Amino acid sequence: MDPFSKSPDDDDLRPEAEAARRPQPQPQPREWRFAQVFGERAAGEDVQEVDIISAIEFDKSGDHLATGDRGGRVVLFERTDSRDSASRSELERQDYPIARHPEFRYKTEFQSHEPEFDYLKSLEIEEKINKIKWCQTANNALFLLSTNDKTIKYWKVQERKVKRISVMNLNTSQSSGNGTTSSSSSSSSRAILPNGGCSEKLYNFPNNDLLFPPGGCTSLRLPVVVTGQDLNLVPRCRRVYSHAHDYHINSISNNSDGETYISADDLRINLWNLEISNQSFNIVDVKPANMEDLTEVITCAEFHPTHCNTLAYSSSKGSIRLIDLRQSALCDNHAKLFEEHEAPGSRSFFTEIIASVSDIKFARDGRHILSRDYMTLKLWDINMDSGPVATFQVHEYLRPKLCDLYENDSIFDKFECCLSGDGLRVATGSYSNLFRVFGCTPGSAEATTLEASRNPMRRQVANPTRPARTLTSLTRAVRRGGENPGVDANGNSYDLSTKLLHLAWHPTENSIACAAANSLYMYYA
């Protein structure tokens, strides 16, 4: 044998190969802490229906947060803390970095949608905001899309300096002709106009009868408009995209090209250009020729985070389809189909109902898709369509109660899901204002239950010592958390009327914003 020839086993002796064989250390479970709350409800206070939050979304930088409510309003928050507030010398003296949570403050709000009535179909159109999506910023202005059941709007929010009129022909502070003294108010009164515009009245006169001084005005002066130093946030509706959906819009998603976006209803997905509001292209149509043959509907759709030609949409049958826009103008055929096959003999009346996917999210790297159905979270690898790589039980204690949940329609609740920016954890909501955080790295046993309150760990569930697994050669799926029987996962009574449907994960930090009725809670780890 040639002494200089390389043995096949030489690679096994290398340090890199040895390190690859060692089990990788698991990330430690995070300790979640309360950060902030906006709109906290007092004990016994009734919540108005229009104030209930219906959508939450961080922008890509994580410096802005938007919420929408059932009253058609959009509220914007901005980050106030400095990410790098500590100096380099201070950081060098520390043994470990101090966890700082992002702090937000109220920025502005505007009326996005108003209630409407479709006279052709005799249907009321709610003003409720279904989804909010941030668009690319430009010229220090914020851009976002908001939608209700039928209409999508494109908003621009920008700071502008307040302009005031400084020279007037009439001085309302002087005595009027009838001997009475009229007072002027320097405070401006603002009225919200349709599409979020604002009218600002700089002078409030006590009555509509302005009396000229005796002898009249000796001269007339042109009013002078002066731009002050005060800044005022002005929301403006740039585009309105309407009359493109016969059914309720359930999702919108921006494309990575920054120019287009999709909107999806129960049967169709349309492709829009942000600058063209009177034309859209139908790219997915699942409506059969005979509606009696309809077997599934579209529940959610989302663009790939980096590939502008790829998008995924989910269905009420629990499947996720990946489509490539380059294949054809109308994407009747999918590139990949992700679905979990039923175990033999496990089908029941509720099987298809609880399998319906209520939300999907792409991981930041675009490699994985997270989906939420009624009972579970599933993590899918887009390169492996044989089954999910991990399944997380959210509230398994409700499975014996499916009949009761069907009777009160709770089984049709649509919970959202989210992933951390590093892809190591996933989160979703449940009942009793609880939400769950799972570690999704292989072998992780992290399964934390938190409550949307000032004390999130009050109803903490003891984590199992090791995850319950079902390992197969085809799916390599992992099932974790929530296997304990009882009233709920911790033996506490659950409340189906308080449910945490909407939440969002900060794109770069371990921070979660979630909605409990009209309150916005924020937590960090």
From Swiss-Prot:
Residues 1-31, 169-191 are annotated as: Disordered. Pfam families: WD40 (PF00400). GO terms for cellular component: protein phosphatase type 2A complex. PROSITE patterns: PR55_1, PR55_2, WD_REPEATS_1. One of its GO terms (molecular function) is protein phosphatase regulator activity. WD repeats lie at residues 48-87, 124-165, 244-282, 293-333, 352-390, 495-525. The keyword Repeat applies. It comes from the Eukaryota. Residues 171-189 have a biased composition (Low complexity). The keyword Metal-binding does not apply. Keywords: Repeat, WD repeat. InterPro entries: PP2A_PR55, PP2A_PR55_CS, WD40/YVTN_repeat-like_dom_sf, WD40_repeat_dom_sf, WD40_rpt. Belongs to the phosphatase 2A regulatory subunit B family. PP2A consists of a common heteromeric enzyme, composed of a catalytic subunit (subunits C), a constant regulatory subunit (subunit A), and a variety of regulatory subunits such as subunits B (the R2/B/PR55/B55, R3/B''/PR72/PR130/PR59 and R5/B'/B56 families). The B regulatory subunit may modulate substrate selectivity and catalytic activity, and may also direct the localization of the catalytic enzyme to a particular subcellular compartment. This is Serine/threonine protein phosphatase 2A 55 kDa regulatory subunit B beta isoform. It comes from Oryza sativa subsp. indica. The lineage of its organism: Eukaryota, Viridiplantae, Streptophyta, Embryophyta, Tracheophyta.
